[in-house]
């Protein structure tokens, strides 16, 4: 890695110091980078800015954004659907859930590198061999490599083409999450209180890995050098996996404790009166208020003022139905 890429960027508002090499989009697909930059340029035209993140974990960023924009910025995270599973188990879940039921508590390393596999064949071979040599129990989701990996990995793990990730992460036998650090997977791991073994590949995954390892301190990196061409060897993988899943290791105990603390913050955020629920309610109130104002403006513009009183009353009644269960907070409190 060149000395230039090791330089730290410390002038982005709300973001802690970060090496230049970890900045998303640097030196990668230029066409894709241009599309992302174009999407970012639309933000200034927005009426609202919604994030599936939690204020408590990124308060500096949210404070900067709320100060910069004249429109409301809402933190609505983690927004994970169907977290309360109950007894709703699909029949195709039964085999791997039964396998998990038979494993010791916190003994399984769950591995998922996203829906769009960008890991090279050589790296996949090293990962499989490293897992086999580590002797650690694992559960690996690999859509297109299932048959091959079953042969290579040995009998200590289970390889499947698909699973209900939230159901697996919330299982008592799962003690670690080898993740590509996509934002959806990151949110789910946080909500389940699982420590991360990060393996970012591209774009925002790199920054998410930084948050996990350096800011929140709830995991380790598998890859120290970012980039698809940087191969992590089977020897290094076996060593890291063994240490990561060692429940008696003091360093491991520390980040497992912090992962549990992160889980509690997530649970408070989505609970009644939490930051996430408060933001969602404020957004709904703002939105319903704007609907009434815009409708009145449209009626006035068309010169139909005489027929609008009963119509306005009906519209206002409809918007109140959205928030009929409880009084909502004053939206002005969340705008800046």
Please place each PLM-identified region on the residue numbering.
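Acidic donor-binding loop of glycosyltransferase active sites
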Residues: 157-158, 172-185, 194
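Polybasic, low-complexity terminal segments and linkers that are predominantly intrinsically disordered
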Residues: 300-336
